Amino acid sequence: MKCAALTGISPDVIKELKAGKPRTIELQSTHNIMSIAGVKPGPDSHIFITSVDLEDLDPGDHGICVVVLAISVSMKRVMEFAHGLYFEERERMSARVQVKYCAPSIVKAVFHEGLTQPTYVEVFKTSCYHAG
């Protein structure tokens, strides 16, 4: 299955998602915002989430596959003051994505053309068996 990839996500967030409850993640990284911007939320919409950094993402890396429930991309204004002499106003783009855990996954192939292009991965869902 080919899907968008979110990289460099905290292992604690991934562990919490594996618990099964839907969670909202706020994204600040440009490459993650670009990857999520083209995704349409829905029951058939999946993304791959991993703690591996984008530069290190290779076939064989592990992560999780999640279902995208909602996406919101917005601009935030940031005011910065320095010693009362001047202030600087900046805008920062961020995205919030609500996801629900689907399955553990492994990367088969990585498709990344640059910082301003979405990152896609070909993944397969892995099975986890417990001896009883």
Regions found by a protein language model. Name each.
Residues I14-E16, D56-P59:
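Short acidic/glycine-rich loop or secondary-structure boundary segments that cap or lie
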Residues M34-S35, P43, M75-F81:
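Residues lining hydrophobic/aromatic ligand-binding pockets adjacent to catalytic sites
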Residues R23, P43-S45, H62-I64:
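A generic structural signal for short beta-strands and their flanking turns/coil linkers
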Residues M1-G42:
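Compositionally biased, charged N-terminal/linker segments
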Residues I36-L57:
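Short coil-to-beta transition motif at edge beta-strands of beta-rich domains
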Residues A4-L6, L17-G20, S45-I49, V68, ...:
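Hydrophobic beta-strand residues in large extracellular and virion-surface proteins
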Residues G63, R77-G132:
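Contiguous surface segments at macromolecular interaction interfaces
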Residues D58-M75:
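Short beta-strand-centered aromatic/proline hotspots
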